[in-house]
């Protein structure tokens, strides 16, 4: 679908021990994102995908690491599908087309380092 709803920022998260998966909540028919950190050198964002929600194919100018937090999703990179489950990670290379489709409800952390 590509409709992403943004939740509140990260100021309330500093110097606290928290469960990463709890930082973005599911919403029916939506993808929810919450930016945890934003610096000139990169970002950390948590996503919560409702069942069957997807980010359509796109590219990014930097490598990005996706870390499964809950559920599972199919991550397509340059036409090849990879099943990402809670506890798994995958690196999406810079400038390669990629997409994310939830298989059931799915949460992930996305870490992008700008270099």
Task: Describe the function of each predicted region.
Residues 30, 43-60:
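Conserved short histidine dyad/triad with adjacent acidic residue
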Residues 1-41:
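A short, N-terminal "cap"/entry segment at the start of jelly-roll beta-barrel domains
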Residues 94-115:
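Ligand-binding loop in jelly-roll beta-barrel domains
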Residues 79-94:
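Short acidic-glycine-tyrosine-enriched beta hairpin
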Residues 43, 72-74, 81, 97, ...:
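Structural motif
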Residues 48-50, 60-75:
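Short, conserved beta-strand element in jelly-roll/cupin
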Residues 69-70, 85-86, 104:
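A cytosolic small-molecule/anion-sensing beta-strand core signal
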